[in-house]
Structures are given as C-alpha cells and as structure tokens.
Regions:
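Surface-exposed helix/loop patches within compact recognition domains
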Residues: 282-284, 288-370
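Catalytic cores of nucleotide-enabled group-transfer and carboxylate-activating enzymes in metabolic
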Residues: 43, 112-118, 398
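Proteolytic cleavage junctions
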Residues: 12-65, 72-76, 89, 103-104, ...
Length: 405
C-alpha cells in the first residue's frame, strides 16, 4: 500500500449521477469456473516426510503452511511445497504454491494456511480473501474459509487433497492502486468472483464480473479532486496541481457481511489509492511556490538508494541508506539526504550549517513499474554563490513518480 504524506486534507463533494440505468453488474446466470493455464514452478521445493502421527510443513518464506493431523495418513509420505511463477487463479493475489503429491487423499482434513501481506489486500479486505485450488481440468475451486486472523494476517481452509493453491480476492475495487497526472482521471470498477450456491459448498471460481449493486452502500473520496460514481463504477478526476496529500484514496463501503468460523464481519470496505503527480521529480520551494518537475529515475540498491531528477544544470536528488520502502528522517550526514541545484548559482540542502532540517522522506518501492514518494523540508539550507554569497533557509515540498534505472 502506498505511503501518505499528510500536510493537509481536503474532502471534495462526491458527484453522483441521479439518472437510473440498468446495472451492468447484475448477474443473469450462475457463474462457472474459469479455466486457466497451469503455472510453472519457481524456486526449490521444501520437502518433509510425514506419517500417521501427522506433522507440519511450510514454505521457505512462511507464506503457506500445511498441518496434517494424526490419522490423516496411513503410511509415511514425502510431502512437498513449491512456489509457482504465477498465481493464475481469477483475481489471484500474492504467491501461489504447488502442494504434492497430487492424487493423495487424506482420511482427515489437513489445514492449509496462507499468510497475506498488505499488498495482497490492496483494493480488498482481509475478510474478502479466499483460498482456491486448481483442478486437473484447469478450473479453480474454493473451499469455505475456516479461519481468519487479522493480527497474524492468515487465512485458513481445510482440504483432503493436494493441488496448486493460491489466494484470491472475492470482491475488490480495480485498479487497487493507480498513478495519474494532475488534471488526469482514473476509471474505477468494483468486481466480484461469485458466491457458492449453497452456504458451505465449494465455490467454482469464475472470471470476475462487476459486483451486484445490492452490495454497494456508498462511495467516498479522501483528498483533493472529485469523484463521480454510479452503482459499481466510478471515475476519479485529479486536481490541476499536485495535491497536498498523496496519495488520495477512494473507499467503497459494502452492504454485506462475511461469516467466518461463526464470527460475523461487518463494515467491509474496499480502498484504492491514487497517486497524483507527473512522472519525474517535482519540488516546490517556499510556501506557495511554483512546482518544478524534472525527468528522472530511481537507483535502488543495497548500498545507497538515489532518486534523481535533472534538466540541464538544475536538479533535485534524495538519497537514503536502508530498505527501499519506508519513512526516513533527514540526517547530519548522507545517510538520508536532499540536495538541489537551481541553476548555476543556487543550491539547497537538508542541512543549514550543522543544523538538520525537520521533515521526512517517504518512499514506496512496491509497485512493479513506479517508485513513488513524497518529502518535506521545514528549514532547507540554501546558498546563493554569486559574490557576495548569501545564505538562508526555506521550506521545500517534493514528490516523485519515477521508474527504476
């Protein structure tokens, strides 16, 4: 999920089209299971010999765990867990795994537990995650969820056989995160992957369709811009300038509950984040100053991470040592730093003499295409090198949306 810099917050009035239309998401026939390719393995398998006494096996990254109870097996078996290159389940989220041997039937159900990440629930909610397996015909089926632990971030089901397994979103807003230019727009849609015809039955996982509008309670926008929505679709319109809060968020409140292991979950919401910034590195010098945007890129590595935007002899750069996603305070050295050259004579820094500016750098490196973030300096030191040199401090805001180089 993207990191938010909260300088100020503005909530614009939603724009709702009152004209009734036929709901494009209203299902007319029962959904059937979607057939997808079988994914190739990726990485080494973890194996364990488990016999009649039962046992546990988990993946190297602990994203999946299988607990086989005593009495489930009559003889010792070599059980393996192997990550797959793709999660091909419709609306799949996160890593998929191959559990073998296929064709083995347990006398008692085994428990399969997936650990989800914050990225896995982008655009959905933990209560709406489900687990599915791929059949020998290529379709996907989902047993009912037997356990949800939102503290440990785990979802569990029970099964009497092995196959290829993965998480998927039973209901979600798409895209779950997006990036638009100031003045641009983003189309939003709410999808579902169906419900079992009989409670407790396995769900044949179909291709996602627009959600039945009876499940939509309302839409809400937090941040600058405007939101037009109708039933299960919406459109976000970004402000003409870089907003004070990035990203903005759109929330769809659902008119439904989920019951998992006897517990009823209410107040379900789907949230998508929208990062509003031009491609490149943008800075605003002084309160109310004009934004300047420079083309640039990100060099993310284990030694020193750099975000640099440059046009001619004018540039802006932030650097930090540490994880590629996080929140960092400026330091006296170059561990977390900012420098900008504005023409041949004007230089800005996160330092003013020995004083370190207040503010912070916030970076998100989780998206496959973009590295995005924001930064503030409450008292950036500046020097004008034209004789006689002049010195001072000013505030600086920055935002970046760049690709890795």
């Amino acid at each position: 999920m993207l990191i938010t810099l909260s300088i100020s917050c503005k909530r614009d009035t939603d724009i709702v089209d009152p004209t009734p239309v036929v709901n494009p998401g209203q299902p007319t026939t029962p959904a059937t299971g979607a057939v997808t390719p079988v994914a190739a393995p990726e990485g080494a398998a973890i194996t364990a010999i488990i016999g009649p006494a039962g046992g546990t096996i988990e993946s190297a990254d602990k994203r999946i765990q299988v607990q086989i109870p005593a009495g489930a097996l009559t003889t010792s078996q070599t059980i393996s867990v192997q990550p797959l290159g793709q999660n091909n389940c419709p609306a799949g989220s996160g890593q998929a795994f191959r559990l073998t041997p296929h064709g083995l039937t347990f006398a008692k159900p085994a428990t399969v537990t997936f650990q989800y990440t914050s990225k896995d629930v982008n655009g959905t909610a933990p209560e709406l995650l489900r687990v599915a397996y791929q059949t020998d015909k290529g379709s996907w089926q989902s047993p009912s969820v037997k356990g949800l632990d939102t503290t440990a971030r785990t979802v569990s089901i029970q099964t009497t056989h092995f196959s290829d397994w993965g998480l998927f979103k039973s209901m979600y807003i798409s895209p779950d995160q997006s990036f638009v230019n100031p003045g641009g727009s983003q189309q939003l849609r709410v999808f579902q992957t169906g419900k079992p015809l009989v409670e407790g039955d396995e769900l044949f996982v179909p291709l996602p369709t627009l959600v039945d509008t009876k499940y939509i309670e309302k839409w809400s926008l937090a941040g600058a811009g405007t939101l037009a929505h109708q039933h299960n679709t919406g459109d976000y319109y970004a402000p003409e300038t870089i907003p004070a809060t990035n990203p903005v968020s759109v929330t769809v409140f659902l008119n439904k509950t989920e019951t998992i292991d006897g517990k009823v979950y209410k107040d379900l919401r789907l949230v998508t984040s929208i990062f509003v910034a031009p491609e490149g590195v943008s800075i605003q010098i002084g309160a109310g100053g004009a934004w300047q945007t420079f083309p640039g890129g990100a060099n993310i590595n284990s030694t020193q991470n750099i975000i640099l935007g440059k046009t001619g002899d004018t540039f802006a750069m932030v650097g930090w040592v540490g994880k590629p996603t996080g929140v960092y305070q400026w330091t006296a050295g170059t561990t977390v730093s900012f420098v900008s050259q504005n023409g041949p004579t004007m230089t800005y820094s996160h330092l003013y003499g020995k004083n370190v500016s207040g503010g912070s750098l916030q970076v998100n490196n989780e998206h496959e295409t973009w590295v995005v973030g924001t930064f503030t300096l409450t008292s950036s030191g500046w020097i004008e090198s034209v004789p006689p040199p002049k010195y001072g401090t000013t505030s600086i805001r920055g935002v970046f949306r760049v690709k890795r180089v």
